[in-house]
């Protein structure tokens, strides 16, 4: 069954023009990849957002962080707030897998840096989380380095939304949640800018 987006039902939110895909990947260079874990009691996963074509550690993409729900267990946001840069791709997973995904990001970034002739002495992985314990047996911590690498390998401009990756076990206001994305194109003076989001 093909997954539908809200616009497929004739509902058009907002008045601002969308990008080509109406997704975060309308921002040039941004890629998204998922690895979904569906086995026995585990329904979870990991989603990675690659911020651009260059090695993030070497390029230092401009970034900011805003905490809407102070109950989260995210990693890496303090340095983003302090320095205003992103040194790694962003990963999203379930609450109890933040540490394992953080570890995998460190390994992946070290490999990328060594390939580019860099020797990082400190890396600030950014990992966001959502507690998916109502659908997923969260204590089994089913997401590890293998799944993070699979999500990286799947990273592309076209990506699935809904019940995939980090959205696999999510619930939102008592309903099944998932991954969603959108983009808008705005004009400032004569120049167009694309804003993309992934939730």
PLM region descriptions:
Residues 1-199:
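Alpha/propeptide regions of enzymes that mature by internal proteolysis
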């Amino acid at each position: 069954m093909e997954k539908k987006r809200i616009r497929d039902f004739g509902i058009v939110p907002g008045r601002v023009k969308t990008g080509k895909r109406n997704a975060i990947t309308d921002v040039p260079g941004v890629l998204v990849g998922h690895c979904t874990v569906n086995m026995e009691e585990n329904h979870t996963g990991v989603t990675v957002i690659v911020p651009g074509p260059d090695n993030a550690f070497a390029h230092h993409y401009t970034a900011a962080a805003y905490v809407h729900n102070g109950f989260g267990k995210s990693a890496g946001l303090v340095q983003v707030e302090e320095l205003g840069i992103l040194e790694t791709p962003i990963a999203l997973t379930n609450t109890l897998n933040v540490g394992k995904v953080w570890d995998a990001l460190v390994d992946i970034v070290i490999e990328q840096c060594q390939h580019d002739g860099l020797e990082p002495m400190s890396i600030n992985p950014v990992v966001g989380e959502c507690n998916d314990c109502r659908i997923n047996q969260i204590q089994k911590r089913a997401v590890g380095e293998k799944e993070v690498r699979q999500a990286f390998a799947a990273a592309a401009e076209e990506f699935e939304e809904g019940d995939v990756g980090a959205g696999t076990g999510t619930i939102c206001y008592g309903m099944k949640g998932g991954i969603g994305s959108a983009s808008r194109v705005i004009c400032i003076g004569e120049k167009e800018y694309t804003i993309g989001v992934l939730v």
